[in-house]
Amino acid sequence: MTFTEQLAAAWQRNDSLLCVGLDPDPQKLPLSLTGAGGAIFSFCREIVDATADLVCAFKPQIAYFHSQRAEDQLEQLIHYIHDAHPGIPVILDAKRGDIGSTAEHYALEAFERYHADAVTVSPYMGFDSMQPYLAYPDRGVIVLCRTSNPGGSDVQFLQVDGKPLYQLVAEAARERWNTTGQMGLVVGATFPNEIARVRQIVGDMPLLIPGIGAQGGDIEATVKAGRTADGTGMMINSSRAILYASREKDFAAAARNVALQTRETINRYRHG
């Protein structure tokens, strides 16, 4: 199955638009795992097992693994998700952006080393920086468009021919870049008006939406702005609020409770 097919199936099977971000901060891991060998993998595995029936995707953030020299644990984690929970796509949050052979090697890293189902990329260097990823026809390429951080406005709201830059990115994705149907866009939950504008531009293209939970994005506004006609179309990401619901031995159960509550809140507004 392609990434988009897996995602659509997971939306239906788990009745969920929730994506759980896997951002394992060693300073916040449960006390029972502190200092243990393979702690990052063990922590993420427990979170995955506790939430896999509640999500449409998992999104490991590559920097949290690389900074701890835990690339092997990231490989192990993605393999584990595919083996233990088949059909749940894994988005490698790498935000890569380069050209030529460097981009080719970043694509190799994402799709042949880590075997991710999709990867996040930056469009700043243009379409040729994305082409190596699109050469993998069964994988997804999720392009930064309107990010959830306040500083994103410094660039993304620059006016070009009377339009903010983020809108031009969305238009380029719709009109020129997404010819193979592999592409999605990142649009932050902290900016629901922009979510609505991007949805208007790109039709049913999947949107990865960070910014709920710890970043304070409003779920109702996010869902109503970004849902497609069938009540899907989004991967609404929550990381810290779920991962660090508890540092005690009940951390996985606590994470599940927060994930369940988040999914239920999202679903309350999907068809309303």
Curated annotation (Swiss-Prot):
Catalytic activity: orotidine 5'-phosphate + H(+) = UMP + CO2
Transmembrane spans: none
Active site positions, chain numbering: K95
Leader sequence residues: none
GO biological process, one term: 'de novo' UMP biosynthetic process
CDD domains: OMP_decarboxylase_like
Short name of any one Pfam family annotated for the protein: OMPdecase
Pathway(s) annotated for this protein in UniProt: Pyrimidine metabolism; UMP biosynthesis via de novo pathway; UMP from orotate: step 2/2
Keywords assigned: Decarboxylase, Lyase, Pyrimidine biosynthesis
InterPro entries to which the protein is assigned, alphabetical: Aldolase_TIM, OMPdecase_AS, OMPdecase_type-2, OMPdeCOase_dom, RibuloseP-bd_barrel
Record has Membrane as a keyword: no
Gene3D superfamilies hit by this protein: Aldolase class I
One Gene Ontology molecular-function label: orotidine-5'-phosphate decarboxylase activity
E.C. designation(s): 4.1.1.23
Protein name, as recorded: Orotidine 5'-phosphate decarboxylase
